[in-house]
From Swiss-Prot:
It is found in: Carboxysome; Cytoplasm. Belongs to the RbcX family. This is RuBisCO chaperone RbcX. One of its GO terms (molecular function) is protein folding chaperone. The keyword Chaperone applies. It comes from Synechocystis sp. (strain ATCC 27184 / PCC 6803 / Kazusa). HAMAP family: RbcX (MF_00855). PANTHER family: CHAPERONIN-LIKE RBCX PROTEIN 1, CHLOROPLASTIC, RUBISCO CHAPERONE RBCX.
Amino acid sequence: MFMQTKHIAQATVKVLQSYLTYQAVLRIQSELGETNPPQAIWLNQYLASHSIQNGETFLTELLDENKELVLRILAVREDIAESVLDFLPGMTRNSLAESNIAHRRHLLERLTRTVAEVDNFPSETSNGESNNNDSPPS
């Protein structure tokens, strides 16, 4: 169980690290659009031909092309991480709890509706007549 939990945590860190890299690139891309349009154009072209899905691979490949930009991405990524990581544990727990409650409520509503529909469905007796217990016997 511990190894599985550790593996999940490591995979989560990798995804989060890539996402922070992506957010840093977006921030820099926006800044460059205002301060250095030629560099912004270069970055846009680079992004069009290189996947940022894996942040670490992206940075390794970019290192061969533009070391300054990599250093800037690293600094911005670290800054973003510093500003959000303290909030993540509590926000994640709360968000998951709220999501789970909403999904359980939706499931319960569906089950209740299904049971109500089954209860309202007219049953038939063995001779093909509707079984109506509300009418008086003849």
